[in-house]
Amino acid sequence: MLGFDPISPAQPTLLIADDDPVVRSMLSLTLDRQFDIVGAARDADQAIALAQASRPDVALIDVQMPGGGGLRAIHGIGDVSPATAAVVLSADEFDPMVRQLMIAGAMSYVRKGIAPAALADVLHRAMQARPALAAA
């Protein structure tokens, strides 16, 4: 039977931020069985607003987006939803911005095209690691 199961624990919430609508759609379709997708942002400003409204457990953020890119999104999301774990997404294998994003608070980095199961695992691990860092 498909649908809501009141006995099952709630799925973790996920915010997706990528300027490419095809990527946003594919990520949503790929991850909707393991996560409750609470928003799909096209730029840093929209990602911050959606994070403030939904307080997601984890945010998957593209490095290169309009409105300040992933760096602005991570700083802004950290300000409005400090418990949200951030995972950086990039098409480039060696993106020079990734180091800055990790320093800014990203929990992990993945490349676009990562296998769906591996991506879900990275997102879950980021959520598990976030409370330990927040408590430290």
Where are these regions (language model features)?
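Non-catalytic signal-transmission and effector/linker regions of two-component phosphorelay proteins
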Residues: 1-13, 120-136
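Acidic, metal-coordinating helix/loop segments flanking the phosphotransfer/catalytic sites
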Residues: 40-58
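Acidic catalytic/metal-coordinating carboxylates
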Residues: 43-46, 67-72
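The short loop immediately C-terminal to the conserved phospho-acceptor aspartate in CheY-like receiver
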Residues: 57, 63-64
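Two-component/phosphorelay signaling modules centered on CheY-like receiver
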Residues: 7, 21-39
